[in-house]
Amino acid sequence: MFQKRVVVIVGFIAIIFFVIIIRLFALQVINNSYYRIQARKYATRIELIADPRGKILDRNGNVLVTNRLAFDLFVTPALYFKSKSNKPKSSATLQVNPTATKEVDYFADQDSDQWEIIRRLANLMKVKTDDIASKMKTIQQKILSQSETKPERERKRFIKQQYRNRYKIFSGLTLAQAVQVESHPELFAGFNVAETISRNYIYNDLACHIIGYTGPIWKEEYDQFVENGYFDDMLNPEIDENTYQALIDMGGFKNAFLGRSGIEKIHNGLLTGRYGVRMSEFDFATKQKDELSRTESIPPTDIMLTIDLDLQKKLEAALKGKSAGAGIVIDVHTGEILAMASAPSFNPNLLQPPVDSQMTEFISKSPLKPLYNRAISGEYPPGSVFKMVTALAALEEGKITAYTPFYCNGHFSPQYKKFKCWIAEHNREHGSLSLEDAFKGSCNVYFYNAGKLAGGDAITRWARNMGFGERTGIDVSGEKKGRVPKLPVDNDALVASISGTNSANLKTSKSTWALSDTLNMSIGQGDLIVTPLQIVRMVAAIANGGTLVRPRIIKSNIHTPHPSSPLRGEEPGEGDNSLGGSAVLIPSAQAVTKVNISAGTLT
């Protein structure tokens, strides 16, 4: 009997050992590669290597935008939860019971060492403890939520891995705050500081609509960027697909900054360069990090603008305090923008981390629209400045000469009583006028007559020849194209040829064009809207004798650009470089130029 019991016990022990041996064999031989990969994943960190963003300078080399050293605060949850009296919570954080992961509150005990760390940090950062706890909870909940999609055997490992990653919770620490955290790891367990680069707009709001601003990647657009391959364009081409995918999986680009408007946006690729990658192993016991491999970054490009700093200052001073307005100074021969401003302005430094949420909301939602670049995005009826196009059309069509007279008694005709000259408001008249006199007095009646002779078709055609109704192609994002009316086929000629027709029968509609529409357009009113930049371009073409230049804001790239496409956003449009396919209009554009100079309207 005793011997039988011994045999049973020995057999039972043998079975246990056999099971253990089989399990060890499975771990060390069959699943060796799987666990080796997993172990390496948990111990390996992949980090982006980024160069400071390229500078932006004016045409004379004055630095407008550079970079300054900044500090970000990161937390490594695994190290944070290992602080002293948290062992019950530490083990709880790694539970994989599906019913428990959503219910455990690791911050309920405000007497724990974790809460003491949070209190110290809140005091240092001058924020509420709840603000930090909320950020920590968000990280924790996201990890637990993601773990639920993993197979049961991988969940615990996944949570451990994610807890060993670093997560940014604050940007824009002062040097004193950064030194305090780094100098006392025992007081701020799990938290560390990383140097980063923040944009520095030296002259605050100066040229803000040209330069634009940078900002973080929004949560709602991150997945879209991944899907469209934006981040692949931001890496050194030598970095392989596996490393890129690992970066995507770990959210390696979520802390990246990119251009949000202006030059910062349209030339984001040049200003950013291309990221490199550093792969290292981190020992959680010793907290030592050993570099395994490195692929260097590709340096960014500095960009020189065409604007002149002193001229820009003077233009912005003229617009200071205005609720709305725009101004542009252009080289009429080259198309270089020497100054461009829009009012009201904004300070892009206020949109850099740490971002004041109230200030951001004010800037983005203010009814004054300070982010709106009225110089290239504002669309308005051009008014009297469009009279130059009317004159050009009438001259080019051979309907008038510079000396053709029209008589202004204050009104166009008895049938069109509402079409009157501004001087009629003062019970006066201009009398007989030449083209030069008409420009001097900005006489509506003269241009009503010139427009009627030229016809709506000719005026709209020459408006398009002068660049209206299309983007100029300036190398800044956000340009609008305005609108030039489209005439029904043959309708204008028909209506304009009818003499003595009652104005009630000439009302415009979607399918008809009336003489009243031609009259309105002749003085820059009606269904015609343009941007300030289009007006400046038109005036430049008349001033230089007929060449329609393409406005540009980039003078040169200081460094040889690398073969990189910018992070795709809104690309500059294409603009024509000539009037109606011909670079010079002779003699009409020159005639209008001479008349305007003589009249004093182009001086």
Where are these regions (language model features)?
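Membrane-proximal periplasmic segments of bacterial cell-envelope enzymes
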Residues: 1-288, 295, 321-326, 332, ...
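Solvent-exposed, polar/charged alpha-helical surfaces in well-ordered, non-transmembrane soluble domains
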Residues: 71, 115-119, 123, 171, ...
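Conserved, well-ordered alpha-helix/loop/beta-strand core segments that scaffold catalytic motifs
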Residues: 285-325
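Glycine-biased, low-complexity coil/linker segments
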Residues: 568-574
